[in-house]
């Protein structure tokens, strides 16, 4: 572990690691051969100084090399966020993924249990009856038959167990909070990617581009949500055709009313599952509005809608026609088969 000590000394000095050095350092971290003290010191020093783009690229490369992959159809996307916005909101990206899949775009959703909220994607899907922690073959079947799968991070990133105790002991977020969302096991190249810190938006979009993504909307709500929000404007950094573009979205521009954070506040997995089911049954409320907005973005990123307004309209129709309800029912059935 002399090489890791060298990398630790570089980070502790305040200097950045090269992409190759970061890849090597995270290979060591994920191998389980680094002591807890060394791992804690390394992650703390990185967090205090702030991670460079090359360090994130190297770290994600190490994560992806060790993950359990899933075969996904061409054109599959993910709708995911870094979490950590402490909003306690409904499971927006989960419902948006269901709506997007109901519109014919395969969604390889990657997520975990709750970190800073009461209900993560894994929690609410389990409450809805979806079997969690499936092997790659079963997930490929979900994608083929339901157009949607849920890849449980703990199943696909087993090497994370080596750093989990250290992360639990540290009273702050580390680079690993962004590595999971950047390491989709299905290798999707189109994403709606929510960030809880506005400073992350541009660098993480560039990281995704470096790692092979072709079309990305990285979003941060003005209220702090790691989603496209309906309480006000959302800042977007878009990767399209190799170019980067910055713009702001307002839900009123696509016919959706403004909401408050209280309107979007959820509860435990059972509460959120009931709310999600109610939307699929036709309930019109703030949860529906924010979900169709994010699904609309997913359709744009997938190339299945020419504008956000068109994407939102298609997501609305997926609910009203019962298609979205059918997508969830198929996912529940196939995942438990």
Curated annotation (Swiss-Prot):
Matching Gene3D superfamilies: Nucleoside phosphorylase/phosphoribosyltransferase catalytic domain, Transferase, Pyrimidine Nucleoside Phosphorylase, Chain C
Keyword Lipoprotein assigned:
no
Enumerate the cofactors the protein uses. Mg(2+)
Positions that bind 5-phospho-alpha-D-ribose 1-diphosphate: 81, 84-85, 89, 91-94, 109-117, 121
* HAMAP family from the UniProt entry: TrpD
* NCBIfam families per UniProt: trpD (TIGR01245)
EC no. given is: 2.4.2.18
Organism, as annotated: Methylorubrum extorquens (strain PA1)
Q: Name the UniProt key words of this record, in alphabetical order.
A: Amino-acid biosynthesis, Aromatic amino acid biosynthesis, Glycosyltransferase, Magnesium, Metal-binding, Transferase, Tryptophan biosynthesis
Q: Which GO annotations describe the biological process of this protein? A: L-tryptophan biosynthetic process
Assembly state and interactors?
Homodimer.
> Mind listing the GO molecular function terms for this protein?
anthranilate phosphoribosyltransferase activity; magnesium ion binding
Q: What is this protein called?
A: Anthranilate phosphoribosyltransferase
- Quick one: which residues bind Mg(2+) 2? 226-227
Identify the pathway: Amino-acid biosynthesis; L-tryptophan biosynthesis; L-tryptophan from chorismate: step 2/5
| Chain residues that bind anthranilate 2 | 167
- A single Gene Ontology CC term: cytosol
Does the record carry Endoplasmic reticulum as a key word? Answer: no
| Binding residues annotated for anthranilate 1, in chain numbering | 81, 112
Q: Which reaction does it catalyse?
A: N-(5-phospho-beta-D-ribosyl)anthranilate + diphosphate = 5-phospho-alpha-D-ribose 1-diphosphate + anthranilate
Database matches in PANTHER family: ANTHRANILATE PHOSPHORIBOSYLTRANSFERASE
């Amino acid at each position: 572990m002399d090489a890791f000590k060298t990398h630790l000394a570089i980070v502790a000095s305040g200097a950045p690691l090269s992409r190759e050095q970061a890849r090597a350092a995270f290979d060591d971290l994920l191998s389980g051969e680094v002591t807890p003290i060394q791992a804690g010191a390394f992650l703390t020093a990185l967090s205090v100084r702030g991670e460079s783009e090359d360090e994130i690229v190297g770290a994600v490369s190490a994560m992806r090399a060790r993950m359990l992959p899933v075969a996904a159809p061409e054109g599959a996307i993910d709708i995911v966020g870094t979490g950590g916005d402490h909003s306690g909101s409904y499971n927006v990206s989960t419902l948006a993924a269901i709506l997007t899949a109901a519109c014919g775009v395969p969604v390889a959703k990657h997520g975990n249990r709750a970190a800073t909220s009461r209900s993560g994607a894994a929690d609410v899907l389990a409450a809805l009856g979806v079997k969690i922690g499936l092997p790659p073959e079963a997930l490929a079947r979900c994608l083929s038959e339901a157009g949607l799968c849920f890849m449980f991070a703990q199943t696909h990133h087993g090497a994370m167990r080596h750093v989990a105790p250290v992360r639990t002991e540290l009273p702050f977020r580390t680079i690993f909070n962004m590595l999971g969302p950047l390491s989709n096991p299905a290798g999707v190249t189109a994403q709606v990617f929510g960030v809880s810190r506005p400073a992350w938006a541009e660098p993480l979009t560039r990281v995704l581009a470096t790692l092979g993504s072709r079309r990305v909307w990285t979003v941060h709500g003005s209220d702090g949500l790691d989603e496209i929000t309906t309480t006000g404007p959302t800042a977007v950094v878009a990767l399209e055709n190799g170019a980067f573009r910055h713009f702001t979205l307002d839900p009123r521009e696509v016919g959706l009313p403004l909401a408050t954070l209280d309107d979007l506040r959820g509860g435990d997995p059972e509460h959120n599952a009931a709310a999600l089911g109610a939307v699929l049954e036709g309930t019109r409320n703030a949860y529906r509005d924010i979900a169709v907005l994010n699904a609309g973005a997913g359709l744009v990123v997938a190339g299945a809608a020419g504008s956000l307004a068109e994407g939102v309209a298609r997501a609305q129709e997926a609910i009203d026609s019962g298609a979205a309800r059918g997508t969830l029912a198929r996912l529940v059935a196939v995942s438990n088969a």
